[in-house]
């Protein structure tokens, strides 16, 4: 039996032998198309080639493209697990011709692949063509020898493909496999076409027209070919299955899920196993391609998929995280074809574990609430949109998760009500924002750009320039003039000032002009991409529209910012080399006094790893190698090994910054990144690099803080001063501070143990002599002062043993707070409840409740001064 890996290799090898370039799958996040959530077909990475905006060094290509359909226009999430052929993740095999061959050769290749390479019987195949595409019908007859009755003309738009409202378009031809009369269903175009007998396996798109304004269409000068064949569907046919989930790759994941959960893969939880198998693939590949769970955009779609799988794990009785345990099974199945999966395995595993652990408590509470609400519904009633929104807003339940849970009970959600609740929340948020005054000012920047255009940036080559004031904004509105004392936003026709973007803070400096004009600039922002807004205060003179001015950037501050920005590039590459290529930038700040760099990394970065990274960056600084910048197309940059931020939209030309001597074959520099910021001339200009902190930002994201140059020297000097001061206090040499502190800590530990032992003996000694009676019951009530709260329970148990029968109430006032423990001997728990007594004590010290068992409970409160009142409250409660 041909495995999925065999099928993929056979397909690609055939087209490689026939003059096609084998192109790697693009990442699931489109490199240069923020309008598309995820790559959902093989042609996405070639979109600009088809439209003529990009040229490649080949005119024929073949790929096995990773695809995700979840969220947005193409969303299969709700159906996954319940049907034989819906997936959030799938692979699309395809061959492409960019103005090279057309219909005849495309049909020839397709027929050769399905009948010769894969050995499908010709009598089991039929095709569809667009109703007017006589050429395709004729070619299928002559090349494949198909009779007329197995060439079906389709009049619907299903067999005519368009890239958009305008642009390349053309008829399609689809190849179908016939499973035979024992399977229900009719041929395409028939009333029973949705049955499983006839399955589409390959779609050939003949791009031969250019769609213009409505009603206009012209022939393309260079017709092209775009084809797509789902690997999972083809595998089902070749492996003799009617269900994609029974094919080798997905079945292996289902079996792994069954082994981990102890649930029969084909039993009552069959659907849940299928959901877990599919969602494991989509979540893992998305994370391997740089997407991490969050509450917005692509990250939120990823989180929705994860949480749907987590609910199905819950349905199978899993009380511990499941998905992360299945990652090795996925890597075994698909790691050979997709190396990025292997490289990101630790990131995927840890992120899944963290997400599952954190969502578990919310899932339990949310499902309990959902169960309560459903219990209030009558037969056939839908769940209100307000309740569904509360589940979303409070417990993190995406709407589709709630719908999925109700679907199993034959119920639905009032989606319109949910949407209304969501709209109302957004309306309130907008109202709060617009009330701040920011909204009113945003419109000004659109008006400025429409009226006078953007600003030309000169800051890569100079820090000083002549310019003209083209717009002034004061108090949120356009103005013609700005006198001395005015807080003003100045827009110039050109500027050397860098506007805050890409993590680099904006420049500061001075604008001067005729008649004593002097404006102190405290910040520079970039609006709408190319409107540079200089924020400052008119110190003297009168600023006017059309006025010629001289602008000068604060050189010392800019130099410090440049050093920090260049250091982040070296840091990024050093982290990837030390921790793995799963490390990707998730955010940054490059300021004059520090840098902050957020990266995808599932676990804390160890002190040893940080030391290695810091040393490597400093070695690169000492190289004093030149920092080079070049302009090229995004595709050229990526081909050279430049790192780009997935999901960012880049123009036709990008700025590529490279630095450091190369250490990797085929890569011309140590670090190569797409970057629009300002940088040092040589790595030596950074001076010194020092990591100051490492912490968590969110699940799967770590933050590194560091300083460079003079800021690093200042910090080292401060650390040295503190070390000398500490050594002086300890009366040892600086080199002996660590040994002396360790010795003191050990001495303290021994003294604390001795003190606790003395307090324990003091508290329990002579218990019988210090016992009072309340209603004929013995009570040992004591204020123990600074005794550690953690000691109270053990002391209460010891005193209770001495009493044999009675109640113990102990209060500690350590650390300025009251801690209370109440114990009741077993023979009295039918008369006195320790929880009730401790809650009375808690109220006296300003606490809110308390908890425990009938024989032992504890509580606390902020008012340590009322410790004796707490003991009296216990007496009163016993006497009541």
UniProtKB/Swiss-Prot annotation:
Q: Which residues form a coiled coil?
A: none
Copy the domain comment. Answer: Consists of three domains; the N-terminal catalytic domain, the editing domain and the C-terminal C-Ala domain. The editing domain removes incorrectly charged amino acids, while the C-Ala domain, along with tRNA(Ala), serves as a bridge to cooperatively bring together the editing and aminoacylation centers thus stimulating deacylation of misacylated tRNAs.
Please provide the record's keywords in A-Z order.
Aminoacyl-tRNA synthetase, ATP-binding, Cytoplasm, Ligase, Metal-binding, Nucleotide-binding, Protein biosynthesis, RNA-binding, tRNA-binding, Zinc
**EC number of this enzyme:** 6.1.1.7
Specify which residues bind Zn(2+) according to the UniProt entry for this protein. 565, 569, 675, 679
Q: Which free-text remark accompanies the cofactor?
A: Binds 1 zinc ion per subunit.
Name the GO terms of the biological process aspect: alanyl-tRNA aminoacylation; negative regulation of DNA-templated transcription
Its protein name is: Alanine--tRNA ligase
Q: What gene is this protein translated from?
A: alaS
In its UniProt record, a GO molecular function of this protein is: ATP binding
The UniProt function text for this chain reads: Catalyzes the attachment of alanine to tRNA(Ala) in a two-step reaction: alanine is first activated by ATP to form Ala-AMP and then transferred to the acceptor end of tRNA(Ala). Also edits incorrectly charged Ser-tRNA(Ala) and Gly-tRNA(Ala) via its editing domain.
Q: Known Gene3D superfamilies for this protein?
A: 2.40.30.130, 3.10.310.40, 3.30.54.20, 6.10.250.550, Bira Bifunctional Protein, Domain 2, Threonyl-trna Synthetase, Chain A, domain 2
The family database entries (InterPro entries) matched by this protein are listed as: aa-tRNA-synth_II/BPL/LPL (IPR045864), Ala-tRNA-lgiase_IIc (IPR002318), Ala-tRNA-ligase_IIc_anticod-bd (IPR018162), Ala-tRNA-synth_IIc_core (IPR018165), Ala-tRNA-synth_IIc_N (IPR018164), Ala-tRNA_ligase (IPR050058), Ala_tRNA_ligase_euk/bac (IPR023033), DHHA1_dom (IPR003156)
Main localisation, per the record? Answer: cytoplasm
Q: Which cofactor does it need?
A: Zn(2+)
> Does DNA-binding count among this protein's keywords?
no
Name the source organism: Granulibacter bethesdensis (strain ATCC BAA-1260 / CGDNIH1)
What family is it from?
A: Belongs to the class-II aminoacyl-tRNA synthetase family.
Reactions catalysed, semicolon-separated, are: tRNA(Ala) + L-alanine + ATP = L-alanyl-tRNA(Ala) + AMP + diphosphate
For this record, the Gene Ontology CC terms, alphabetical, are: cytosol
The record's subcellular location field reads:
Cytoplasm
């Amino acid at each position: 039996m041909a495995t999925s890996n065999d099928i993929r290799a056979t397909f690609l090898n055939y087209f490689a032998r026939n003059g096609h370039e084998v192109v790697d799958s693009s990442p699931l996040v489109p490199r240069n198309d923020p309008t598309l959530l995820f790559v959902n077909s093989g042609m996405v990475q070639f979109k600009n080639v088809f439209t003529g905006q990009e040229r490649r060094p080949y005119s024929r290509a073949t790929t096995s493209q990773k695809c995700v359909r979840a969220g947005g226009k193409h969303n299969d999430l709700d159906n996954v697990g319940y049907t034989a052929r819906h997936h959030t993740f799938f692979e699309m095999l395809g061959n492409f011709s960019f103005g090279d061959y057309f219909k005849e050769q495309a049909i020839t290749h397709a027929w050769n692949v399905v009948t010769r390479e894969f050995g499908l019987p010709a009598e089991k195949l039929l095709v569809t063509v667009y109703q007017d595409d006589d050429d395709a019908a004729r070619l299928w007859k002559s090349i494949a020898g198909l009779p007329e009755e197995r060439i079906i003309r389709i009049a619907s738009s299903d067999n005519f493909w368009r890239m958009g409202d305008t642009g390349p378009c053309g008829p399609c031809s689809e190849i179908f496999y016939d499973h035979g009369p024992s399977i229900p269903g009719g041929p395409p175009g028939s009333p029973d076409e949705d049955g499983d007998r006839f399955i589409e396996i390959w779609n050939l798109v003949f791009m031969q027209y250019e769609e213009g304004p409505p009603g206009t269409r012209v022939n393309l000068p260079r017709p092209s070919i775009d084809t797509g064949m789902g690997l999972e569907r083809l595998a089902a046919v070749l492996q003799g299955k009617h269900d994609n989930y029974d094919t080798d790759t997905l079945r292996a994941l289902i079996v792994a899920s069954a082994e981990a959960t102890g649930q029969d893969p084909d039993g009552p939880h069959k659907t849940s196993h299928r959901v877990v198998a599919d969602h494991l693939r989509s979540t893992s590949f998305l994370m391997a391609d740089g997407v991490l769970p969050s509450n917005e955009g692509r990250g939120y779609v990823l989180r929705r998929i994860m949480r749907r799988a987590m609910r199905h794990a819950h349905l199978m009785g899993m009380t511990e995280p499941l998905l992360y345990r299945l990652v090795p099974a996925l890597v075994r199945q698909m790691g050979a074809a997709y190396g990025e999966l292997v490289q990101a395995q630790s990131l995927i595993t840890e992120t899944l574990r963290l997400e599952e652990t954190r969502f578990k408590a919310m899932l339990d509470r949310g499902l309990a609430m959902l169960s309560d609400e459903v219990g209030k519904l009558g037969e056939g009633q839908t769940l209100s949109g307000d309740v569904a929104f509360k589940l979303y807003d409070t417990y993190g339940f995406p709407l589709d998760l709630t719908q999925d849970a109700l679907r199993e009970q034959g119920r639905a959600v009032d989606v319109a009500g949910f949407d209304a609740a969501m709209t109302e929340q957004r309306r309130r948020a907008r109202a709060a924002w617009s009330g701040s005054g920011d909204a009113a000012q945003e419109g000004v920047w659109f008006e400025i750009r429409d009226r006078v255009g953007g600003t030309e940036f000169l800051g890569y080559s100079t820090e000083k320039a002549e310019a003209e004031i083209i717009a002034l904004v004061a108090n949120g509105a356009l103005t013609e003039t700005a006198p001395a004392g005015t807080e003003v936003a100045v827009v110039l026709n050109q500027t050397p000032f860098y506007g805050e973007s890409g993590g680099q803070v904006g420049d500061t400096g001075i604008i001067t002009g005729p008649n004593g004009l002097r404006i102190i600039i405290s910040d520079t922002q970039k609006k709408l991409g190319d409107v540079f807004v200089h924020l400052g205060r008119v110190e003297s003179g009168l600023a006017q529209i059309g006025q010629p001015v001289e602008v000068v950037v604060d050189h010392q501050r800019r130099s410090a910012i440049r050093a920090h920005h260049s250091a982040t590039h070296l840091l990024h590459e050093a982290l990837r080399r030390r921790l793995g290529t799963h490390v990707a930038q998730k955010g940054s700040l490059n300021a004059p006094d520090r840098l902050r760099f957020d990266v995808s990394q599932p676990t804390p970065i160890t002190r040893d790893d940080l030391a290695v990274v810091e040393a490597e960056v400093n070695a690169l600084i000492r190289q004093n190698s030149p920092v080079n910048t070049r302009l090229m197309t995004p595709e050229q940059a990526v081909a050279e090994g430049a790192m780009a931020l997935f999901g960012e939209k880049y123009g036709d030309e990008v700025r590529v910054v490279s630095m450091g001597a190369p250490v990797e074959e085929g890569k011309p520099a140590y670090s190569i990144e797409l970057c629009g910021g300002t940088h040092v001339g040589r790595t030596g200009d950074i001076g010194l690099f020092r990591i100051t902190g490492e912490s968590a930002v969110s699940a799967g994201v770590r933050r590194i803080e560091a300083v460079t140059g003079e800021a690093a020297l200042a910090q080292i000097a401060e650390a040295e001063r503190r070390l000398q001061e500490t050594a002086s206090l300890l009366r040892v040499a600086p080199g002996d501070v660590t040994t002396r502190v360790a010795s003191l800590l050990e001495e303290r530990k021994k003294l604390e143990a001795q003190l606790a032992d003395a307090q324990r003996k003091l508290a329990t000694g002579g218990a019988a002599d210090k016992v009072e009676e309340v209603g004929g019951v013995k009570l040992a009530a004591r204020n123990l002062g600074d005794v550690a709260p953690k000691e109270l329970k053990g002391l209460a148990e010891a005193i209770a043993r001495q009493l044999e029968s009675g109640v113990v109430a102990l209060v500690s006032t350590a650390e300025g707070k009251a801690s209370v423990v109440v114990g009741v001997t077993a023979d009295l728990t039918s008369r006195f409840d320790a929880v009730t007594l401790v809650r009375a004590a808690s109220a006296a010290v300003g606490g809110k409740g308390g908890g425990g068992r009938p024989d032992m409970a504890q509580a606390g409160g902020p008012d340590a001064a009322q410790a004796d009142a707490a003991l009296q409250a216990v007496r009163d409660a016993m006497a009541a």
